[in-house]
Amino acid sequence: MASSSGQNGIQLLLAAEQEAQHIVNNARTAKQARLKQAKEEAEKEIAEFRAYMEAEFQRKLEQTSGDSGANVKRLEQETDAKIEHLKTEAERVSPDVVQMLLRHVTTVKN
């Protein structure tokens, strides 16, 4: 009877060990499934964020490149206006400068 009860105890322990192994395997499988799902969700969020940032970059690039054409045109106009102003001023003071130079060149000092 003692050996039968010992045999039953061993069988009970083996069954409990198998049950525990089954529980551990189920937990491991569930954990792997959760990790896989979390990884997929993270990759999806990363892809969405990357697409958003790329769209923002392209939008800003279009704005700045569009502005640069306008800026170049504006700068050309400002430069042309300054050149015309300098030409006008040069024409205005040119006779005075010529007179001053002639006076200094023709005046003899001892």
UniProtKB/Swiss-Prot annotation:
GO terms for molecular function: ATP hydrolysis activity; proton-transporting ATPase activity, rotational mechanism. GO terms for cellular component: vacuolar proton-transporting V-type ATPase, V1 domain. InterPro entries: V-ATPase_G. Gene3D superfamilies: 1.20.5.2950. It holds the Pfam family V-ATPase_G. Keywords: Hydrogen ion transport, Ion transport, Transport. V-ATPase is a heteromultimeric enzyme composed of a peripheral catalytic V1 complex (components A to H) attached to an integral membrane V0 proton pore complex (components: a, c, c', c'' and d). Catalytic subunit of the peripheral V1 complex of vacuolar ATPase (V-ATPase). V-ATPase is responsible for acidifying a variety of intracellular compartments in eukaryotic cells. Belongs to the V-ATPase G subunit family. This is V-type proton ATPase subunit G 1. It comes from Nicotiana tabacum. The gene is VATG1.
